[in-house]
């Protein structure tokens, strides 16, 4: 496949949506319709329906493995219907969360095991990993304070988990960053948004010299 695949990861409150919006705008200005933005869970009609079930606060009784399997099922549809066709067409994909989120949230946060969630998702991704993953990292307490202050009206089922849950999520992300240093670039998200965006631009340019050339 001739395209390029960049995923964006991070614990809740890391500012991922704001950063990704700025990066997306800059790359669309440079590359136009060669840029494909997508997200997980979601990215196509079937996967978006699964997303609605997963994030609905009314589904608090959902079993942890049911949750993990639903994320994997949504991801499989995303890979087959959205990601692989875009890569085969030579597009640049910007993906808001991917496999690492399942490993962090279900493997770490839910304590189902990093390796077990990795193995489960091999059926979903069919060998497809990002070329580059931007991991926005910050202290758990800072992230949760941002959520409470900035987007209380859009808090979802996973946002409502305990502080210890979110600590386990962050630790799983840090473990992944150590395990896959050639793919995952950690960016300090505990700084001014403009600085975070600039650091992300620099990380992308370091991997792809033709992007963010000005």
From Swiss-Prot:
GO CC field: cytosol
Entry keyword Ligase: no
SUPFAM superfamilies: P-loop containing nucleoside triphosphate hydrolases
Catalytic activity entry: dTMP + ATP = dTDP + ADP
GO molecular function terms noted in the UniProt entry: ATP binding; dTMP kinase activity
EC number(s) from the headed UniProt entry: 2.7.4.9
UniProt record, GO biological process: dTDP biosynthetic process; dTTP biosynthetic process; dUDP biosynthetic process
InterPro entries: P-loop_NTPase, Thymidylate_kin-like_dom, Thymidylate_kin_CS, Thymidylate_kinase
Sequence positions that bind ATP: 10-17
Keyword field: ATP-binding, Kinase, Nucleotide biosynthesis, Nucleotide-binding, Transferase
Group of enzyme by EC: transferase
Keyword Transferase attached: yes
Function, in words: Phosphorylation of dTMP to form dTDP in both de novo and salvage pathways of dTTP synthesis.
Protein name in the entry: Thymidylate kinase
Organism of provenance: Limosilactobacillus fermentum (strain NBRC 3956 / LMG 18251)
């Amino acid at each position: 496949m001739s395209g390029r695949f960049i995923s964006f990861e991070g614990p809740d409150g890391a500012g991922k949506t704001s950063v990704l919006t700025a990066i997306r705008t800059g790359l669309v200005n440079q590359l136009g319709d060669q840029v494909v933005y997508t997200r997980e869970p979601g990215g196509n009609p079937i996967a978006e329906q699964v997303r609605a079930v997963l994030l609905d606060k009314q589904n608090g009784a959902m079993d942890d493995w049911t949750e993990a399997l639903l994320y994997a099922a949504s991801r499989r549809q995303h890979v087959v219907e959205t990601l692989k066709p875009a890569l085969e067409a030579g597009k640049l994909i910007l993906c808001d969360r991917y496999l690492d989120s399942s490993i962090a949230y279900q493997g770490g946060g839910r304590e189902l095991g990093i390796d077990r969630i990795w193995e489960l998702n091999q059926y979903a991704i069919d060998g497809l990993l990002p070329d580059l993953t931007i991991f926005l990292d910050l202290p758990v307490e800072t992230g949760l304070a941002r959520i409470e202050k900035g987007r209380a009206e859009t808090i979802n089922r996973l946002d409502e988990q305990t502080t210890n849950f979110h600590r386990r999520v962050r630790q799983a992300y840090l473990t992944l960053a150590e395990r896959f240093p050639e793919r995952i670039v950690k960016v300090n998200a505990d700084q001014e948004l403009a600085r975070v965006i600039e650091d992300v631009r620099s990380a992308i340019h370091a991997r792809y010299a033709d992007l963010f050339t000005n």
